[in-house]
Amino acid sequence: MAPVALLSVSDKSGLVPLAEALHRTHGYQLLSSGGTAKVLEQAGLPVTRVSDHTGAPEILGGRVKTLHPRVHGGILAKRGDASHQADLEQQNIAPIDMVVVNLYPFRETIARPDVTWDQAIENIDIGGPAMVRAAAKNHADVAVLTSPDQYDRLLTAMAESGGSVPSALRRQLALEAFNHTASYDTAIGRWMAEQATAKGCPWLEAVPLRQTLRYGENPHQKARWFSHPKQGWGGAIQLQGKELSTNNLLDLEAALATVREFGYGADGSAPASQPAAVVVKHTNPCGVAVGASMPAALTRALDADRVSAFGGIIAMNDVVEATAARELTSLFLECVVAPGFTPEAREVLAAKANLRLLELAPQAIDVAGPDHVRSILGGLLVQDLDDQAITPTDWTVASQRPPTPQEKLDLEFAWRLVRHVRSNAIVVAKDGQSLGVGAGQMNRVGSARIALEAAGEKAQGAVLASDGFFPFDDTVRLAASQGITAVIHPGGSMRDGDSIKACDELGLAMQLTGRRHFLH
């Protein structure tokens, strides 16, 4: 039996050469409908109309053409399944081996300034996506093409494999097909949302709307929160407090990412590697500390910068008990997130009725996606998260003097923090506590001045971390003048030698990590 290709396309580009190659070179029978069939017939190719194949005419003004068991049965039947083959034989259904479909031009239609609602609705394809998805599902036996850009790739592969479509190509085409239909449906959903709200999310993905927020970063901005119901922040339980805001969620994200540097556990089932607390303001950590206990870590984090902690967001990496809860009530805070809160802690914190308490289990974090997505004008930027493991054994000592054992611990602590600070980023730290943070300055030495000023006299004997290399030796010399004894940075500047020379002159130790951690 000759293989069968079903062709039904809105974009006729490359259609005739493809059909000619399939029929005349590879012996395919051509099955088609509507305008596609007419183009093929005019090119002198033998075509079986879908209506003749099914015995059912097109109805509802063309809304129903291919939605028929003789079409979908032929596409979905598994060739190696005896029961499927018996069904085909009993119903007199011929297998369909290739589906070439591109969809109604919905995006092009809605791009017209004078488009009406009814015109847009009529350009929502139904039968096309159904055939594409059916063929993609059964890619073990069926090849599916959704774009003229794929035709040459298909014909080249068929020529190289004696007329068959390689299984690897069928799988890749299936992947592209599912992405194609997902994008198509997203465009429809986005357009309908825009019609309903006058201004919708321009890159709405297939993520459920969790909540319409009070406003965005500022009161004049509208905002919505889309989230998987059980993953990431969608899996958090708000125990008390006011409704979450856009800024709350952004700060919570920053606080959680920072505190996870020290492990994240709950109820002792997956204990944190070291009790840690983080205070965040405007997505930058302003106080971070580890301690022998959760209350100790919290007190040290707040003491790092109590002025900036006012109105802040706090993340802790283990269960919050009553002692820590009492510390939390000592100042005004927006939100606290932790793996859990004891009943006694809940009772203490209930006195702060507006304080938002969020319980976020490690399981909700573990299943969160691996990508960082940001919107730009007309598109999206998608990158890997900057969460690779920190491995001090890979670092090198650039200075004549190596860091002492305590300096090594402090340098690792500071390096864990600096990648969570907006660039240009500088962190001053000592004994598992941040002492000063310089964030978001346009030059590195400016961030260093801010961090060192915040640390004050505590900078004596502390270390300094920089998220990028030192372009000049000015930061090293400034750090030494304030009592810093060791520095850490990625290295890679043409003038690394100047900074290393300054360290040697001033008695500082310098470690190079070889990895930059810019955060924009």
UniProtKB/Swiss-Prot annotation:
Q: Which UniProt keywords apply?
A: Hydrolase, Multifunctional enzyme, Purine biosynthesis, Transferase
Lineage: superkingdom: Bacteria
Location of the MGS-like domain:
1-146
Q: Which GO terms describe its cellular component?
A: cytosol
Extract the SUPFAM superfamilies matched here: Cytidine deaminase-like (SSF53927), Methylglyoxal synthase-like (SSF52335)
GO biological process terms held by the UniProt record = 'de novo' IMP biosynthetic process
Per its UniProt record, what Pfam families does this chain match? AICARFT_IMPCHas (PF01808), MGS (PF02142)
Q: Which GO terms describe its molecular function?
A: IMP cyclohydrolase activity; phosphoribosylaminoimidazolecarboxamide formyltransferase activity
Pathway assigned in UniProt: Purine metabolism; IMP biosynthesis via de novo pathway; 5-formamido-1-(5-phospho-D-ribosyl)imidazole-4-carboxamide from 5-amino-1-(5-phospho-D-ribosyl)imidazole-4-carboxamide (10-formyl THF route): step 1/1; Purine metabolism; IMP biosynthesis via de novo pathway; IMP from 5-formamido-1-(5-phospho-D-ribosyl)imidazole-4-carboxamide: step 1/1
Q: Which reaction does it catalyse?
A: (6R)-10-formyltetrahydrofolate + 5-amino-1-(5-phospho-beta-D-ribosyl)imidazole-4-carboxamide = 5-formamido-1-(5-phospho-D-ribosyl)imidazole-4-carboxamide + (6S)-5,6,7,8-tetrahydrofolate; IMP + H2O = 5-formamido-1-(5-phospho-D-ribosyl)imidazole-4-carboxamide
Query: Any notes on this protein's domains?
Result: The IMP cyclohydrolase activity resides in the N-terminal region.
Protein name from the UniProt record: Bifunctional purine biosynthesis protein PurH
Organism for this UniProt entry: Synechococcus sp. (strain CC9605)
